[in-house]
């Protein structure tokens, strides 16, 4: 459209008449006003973090991609009803998660609408889902809410990896709003951690994902609690695809599992546990009954979850499988495939710490040099010693086993270990050292 014709367009004429600068409030935005805007929208607490804060440096590139020119993050919390989360009836707990999640998203959307009307650019990424699933299994979320909330002074991470608000405890969901304006006053992290280190989350977790020394087994939590999300759903879909007929499908998947998956597809994906949140007594509004009678808390909250008869989903040979057997004889294990499957070498390197099973490595002391060729070229050193994993770029030290592999072949091998012999014969995977060490390596990363 020619410029003179564009200038004559009614929309352009009207826009030229309007003084747009009068709509946008002066910067920096008043922090008290912005906080009240969020509280009026339904938030229970609010904090502000500048984009240059070192605490969120690792997110800055992604945040700028989501909202070019972002300058401030508004972090807010929505309080959940505690007893709904504590009940062994997980349908009640999931209803609370879903309702509070929707409420959190509605708060964000309302605040964004108010700011947009003032010519302040803003977006509200989802509290949980939807995410950018085209990036799965790598980072699919737009913003990592937990580090932002901690930086904003809305709590600290507990041993169970949930943010514990000083007043509301861990019975909260988190939201973040990105805006292109500065704020008059930013909030800072609180000076103490509300976590009591009572270790009730360690006791209640059915998969052993939380260890008393602070170690977190991500894959144990992900495999069970998120069974009806993302990778777990993919594993179920593969069971459908591989079944020869209805009888074969029912031999793989129980009627209750099929109904549960239908329920998640129809009413929102349901968590299998989240018991770590259920039993946590931290927070000023929460701690009173626990301080008054810890035995009653154990009897009324912790023990019913521990004693609940249920299926726990585990990867064969994982630490979680052994934990359920040792600690929860009333719970059943069901073998499922590892759903955190890398589709690139970069994804593989990022994922190794997430799927490492340290109890399977208790007798190991070995260094591995990997050289990947083909579609992706990369060298890494993996050291497993004293139940600890270290992954470093490049080759360092003297290895116990050298592995040279074509990238595509190695990724196929991870998905289907039985093809190793074929790959060795074809020289697409080459070993220098004892093959036993490759077997030991695989034991630490079961699939």
Task: Describe the predicted segments one by one.
Residues 73-75, 176, 279, 381:
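Conserved hydrophobic/aromatic beta-strand scaffold that supports enzyme active sites
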Residues 33, 106-110, 114, 351, ...:
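Long, highly charged amphipathic alpha-helices
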Residues 70, 173, 276, 366, ...:
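Residues that flank catalytic or metal-binding motifs in active/ligand-binding sites
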Residues 64-69, 164-171, 395:
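Short glycine/proline-enriched loop/turn "hinge" motifs that connect secondary-structure elements
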Residues 57, 99-284, 288-300:
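Catalytic cores of enzyme domains
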Residues 83, 184-188, 390-393:
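Short small-residue beta-strand/loop micro-motif enriched in glycine and branched aliphatics
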Residues 1-104:
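Non-catalytic, usually N-terminal nucleic-acid engagement modules in DNA/RNA processing proteins
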Residues 300-447:
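Feature captures hydrophobic
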């Amino acid at each position: 459209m020619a410029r003179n014709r564009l200038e004559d367009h009614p929309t352009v004429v009207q826009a030229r008449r309007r003084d747009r600068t009068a709509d946008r409030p002066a910067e920096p935005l008043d922090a008290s006003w912005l906080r009240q805007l969020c509280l009026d929208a339904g938030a229970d607490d609010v904090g502000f973090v500048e984009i240059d804060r070192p605490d969120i440096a690792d997110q800055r590139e992604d945040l700028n991609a989501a909202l070019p020119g972002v300058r401030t993050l508004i972090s807010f919390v929505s309080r959940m009803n505690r007893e709904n989360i504590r009940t062994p009836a997980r349908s009640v707990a999931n209803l609370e998660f879903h309702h509070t999640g929707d409420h959190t998203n509605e708060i964000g959307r309302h605040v964004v609408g108010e700011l947009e009307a003032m010519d302040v650019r803003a977006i509200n990424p989802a509290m949980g889902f939807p995410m950018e699933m085209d990036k799965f299994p790598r980072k699919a979320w737009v913003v990592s809410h937990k580090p932002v909330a901690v930086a904003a002074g809305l709590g600290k991470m507990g041993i169970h990896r949930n943010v514990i608000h000083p007043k509301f405890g861990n019975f909260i969901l988190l939201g973040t709003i990105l805006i292109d304006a500065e704020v008059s006053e930013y909030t800072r992290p609180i000076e103490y951690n509300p976590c009591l280190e009572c270790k009730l989350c360690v006791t209640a977790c059915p998969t052993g994902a939380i260890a008393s020394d602070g170690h977190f087994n991500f894959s144990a939590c992900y495999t069970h609690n998120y069974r009806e999300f993302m990778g777990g759903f993919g594993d179920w879909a593969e069971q459908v695809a591989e079944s020869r007929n209805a009888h074969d499908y029912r031999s793989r998947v129980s009627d209750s599992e099929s109904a549960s998956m239908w329920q998640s597809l129809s009413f929102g994906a349901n968590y299998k546990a989240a018991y770590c949140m259920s039993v946590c007594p931290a927070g000023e509004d929460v701690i009173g009954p626990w301080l008054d009678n810890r035995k009653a808390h154990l009897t009324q909250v912790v023990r019913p979850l521990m004693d609940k008869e249920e299926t726990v989903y585990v990867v064969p040979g994982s630490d979680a499988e052994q934990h359920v057997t040792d600690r929860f004889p009333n719970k059943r294990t069901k073998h499922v495939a590892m759903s955190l499957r890398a589709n690139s070498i970069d994804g593989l390197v990022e994922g190794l710490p997430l799927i490492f099973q340290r109890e399977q490595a208790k007798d190991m002391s070995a260094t591995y040099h990997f050289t990947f060729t083909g579609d992706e070229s990369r060298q890494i050193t993996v050291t497993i010693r004293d139940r600890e994993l270290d992954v470093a770029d490049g080759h360092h030290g003297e290895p116990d086993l050298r592995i040279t592999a074509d990238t595509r072949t190695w990724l196929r091998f991870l998905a289907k270990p039985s093809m190793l012999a074929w790959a060795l014969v074809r020289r697409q995977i080459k070993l220098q050292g004892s093959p036993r060490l490759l077997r030991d390596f695989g034991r630490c990363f079961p699939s």
